[in-house]
């Protein structure tokens, strides 16, 4: 499946949130 546009603020927010959660679990 094609990746959604990188300019999508909701996508960026989700990626940032997921990244933050992953780092918090380390």
UniProtKB/Swiss-Prot annotation:
It is found in: Secreted. GO terms for cellular component: extracellular region; extracellular space. GO terms for molecular function: cytokine activity; hormone activity. InterPro entries: 4_helix_cytokine-like_core. Keywords: Cytokine, Hormone, Secreted. The keyword Cytoplasm does not apply. One of its GO terms (biological process) is thrombopoietin-mediated signaling pathway. Its main location: secreted. SUPFAM superfamilies: 4-helical cytokines. It comes from the Eukaryota. Lineage-specific cytokine affecting the proliferation and maturation of megakaryocytes from their committed progenitor cells. It acts at a late stage of megakaryocyte development. It may be the major physiological regulator of circulating platelets. Belongs to the EPO/TPO family. Two-domain structure with an erythropoietin-like N-terminal and a Ser/Pro/Thr-rich C-terminal. This is Thrombopoietin. It comes from Sus scrofa.
